[in-house]
């Protein structure tokens, strides 16, 4: 989905979770935005709105980054790739630099579309990001 789709559903999804909402939300948006050539400023605006909504609800947030493929051009990639670390710093939230670390571009870990992780790819992602999630939920 796009960051706009996530933003438009966040309040509804949040309110449907019992006991006042989730303890932690992992924000992982932007991949479809970049593939559709959305302006990075639009993606940033949508993700920042989600971060602010969750912070206002006192919900822990883990922001995960995406990266622009090289075919989008260096200027686009530079602007897009900066969204995530900039927002994490601005809002003082934990940041996992690249959601698809170790999976992106590895054919054996992706579905036939070459973009979305397959079952083995998901295992790699969970093993890499899992410690961040556990630490945020339960501390070290």
Describe the predicted segments one by one.
Residues 1-3:
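Short beta->alpha junction loops
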Residues 8-140:
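Alpha-helical cap/lid subdomain in secreted, periplasmic
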